[in-house]
């Protein structure tokens, strides 16, 4: 089994961090992007972010870009394996929502 298949559910911060890496970004830009995507509902601190970055690199889900030596900010991007893991999570969440909607619709039909 690949790591993407073994990934399990992503935490909400990890979900948004991985989503953000669909575009190459540096750490601070990720923190800003997550706040923007979630309308300020999710805020990621530097410790959480860089811990997640290290974990995602270890899993092979993101990679560092080779920037110019003069660049102070290190940029990262999602890998194919990271995209596979992310899309697996999106599918899991869609199935979860479909199950919930089915139960709600059935309950509403019985109440009517």
For the regions a language model picked out, list residue spans one by one.
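Beta-hairpin "wing" of winged helix-turn-helix
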Residues: 57-72, 77
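N-terminal helix-turn-helix DNA-binding core of bacterial DNA-binding proteins
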Residues: 5-48
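Basic, amphipathic "hinge/linker" alpha-helix immediately C-terminal to the N-terminal HTH DNA-binding motif
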Residues: 71-90
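Intrinsically disordered, low-complexity serine/threonine- and proline-rich regulatory segments
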Residues: 1-10, 96-98
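Amphipathic alpha-helical dimerization/coiled-coil segments
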Residues: 87-112
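Basic amphipathic alpha-helical segments that dock to polyanions
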Residues: 49-50, 56
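A cross-family signal for key residues in well-ordered alpha-helices
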Residues: 19, 32, 54, 87, ...
């Amino acid at each position: 089994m690949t790591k993407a298949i073994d990934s399990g559910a992503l935490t909400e911060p990890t979900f948004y961090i991985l989503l953000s890496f669909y575009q190459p970004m540096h750490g601070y830009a990720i923190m800003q992007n997550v706040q923007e995507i979630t309308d300020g509902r999710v805020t990621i601190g530097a410790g959480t972010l860089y811990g997640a970055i290290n974990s995602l690199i270890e899993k092979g889900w993101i990679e560092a870009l080779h920037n110019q030596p003069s660049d102070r900010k290190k940029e990262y991007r999602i890998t194919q394996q990271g995209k596979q893991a992310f899309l697996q999570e999106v599918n899991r969440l869609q199935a979860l929502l479909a199950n919930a909607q089915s139960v709600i619709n059935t309950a509403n039909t019985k109440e009517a």
